[in-house]
Amino acid sequence: MKLGIVGAGLIVNTLLEFIHEVDIELIAISATPAEKDKLLDLQNKHGFKYVYTDYDEMLQNNEVDTVYLGVNNHLHFTFALKALQANKHIILEKPFTSNYNQALKLVNLAKEKHLMIFEAISTIHNPNFKKIEELLPSLGDVKIVTLNYTQYSSRYDAFKKGEILPAFDYKKSGGALMDLNIYNIHFIIGLFGSPKSVDYIANIKENIDTSGILTMDYGTFKAVLIAAKDCGAPYTNCIQADEGCIYTSSPMFTLTHFEHQLNKQDPIHYDLTNNAHRMKHEFLDFLEIFNKKDYAADEKIMEHSLAVMKVITEARSKIDLVFPDDQNI
């Protein structure tokens, strides 16, 4: 895989913390002209062959076969569409797009052009998640799932003072659902598939959900997914069933450990990440699929992302949360 990276912000710097540990060649990096100094610094530190302040120019570089998009949410669809049109595979930061219709258009085009799209979401590639998936049948009939990712945002104080940064900006497809609850949604859909119905209630300020509660009805069991950027509390996550439970005090963002406990038995502790960077496992999965040209595996990943975006889009409709980017299709 020969990677071209788009962006020079926090998530790109997080990616670069571990990317040299996997067999990916860093070819190019692109951002805005205002970020030129950052780009040159990253080139010096990480050995990029090319630096661009024009995304379209980077897409013309034939040495780049895959583009990683670490840009604001509202730019995901436009940037991904251009990459596909330039015959590039894509690693697209979560959330996949602003809405389901955008996601569907990207997936259909990728299939048509025989290209791969990977959503960069750590949760479902985490070894602990895969172990939970393996242990799930031992619990019997699932009855209740509760997931809670509440984290007082470092940007919320500024937000209260009127400074609206991307994570709280509806114009940039931000909010608690898109930024935090998406990890919970990926977790539950990864284990159980799509629900029969969803509902969403939220605390709204400046046209954005600063916190909210998403309910998902699976018929035989119910799930409550909580996310908040305007308050914080200890993380509590539990799958409750008639023969046992699986629980963790780790958010789905990192899922560093969990406990598996059957009725009348002591809990068994699991921590299978080997202290690896939280994003490393997903990129190892992407690389394996890419190198094997396993389009069936990638299609499964894309279908999973579509299911997540369908839930998010329906949840937003429950609170009339509209993004300007919704018109971009």
Question: Predicted segment positions?
Answer:
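Predominantly a Rossmann-like dinucleotide-binding segment in NAD(P)-dependent oxidoreductases
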Residues: 126-195
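Contiguous beta-strand/loop segments that form the cofactor/metal-binding neighborhood of enzyme cores
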Residues: 184-254, 284-292
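C-terminal helix-rich "cap/oligomerization" subdomain common to oxidoreductases
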Residues: 66-68, 285-329
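Hydrophobic residues in well-ordered beta-strands that form the structural core
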Residues: 52, 92-93, 117-119, 248
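N-terminal Rossmann-like dinucleotide-binding module
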Residues: 1-46
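Beta-loop-alpha module in the N-terminal Rossmann-like domain of NAD(P)-dependent dehydrogenases
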Residues: 5, 15, 49-109
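Rossmann-fold dehydrogenase core element
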Residues: 105-123, 141-144
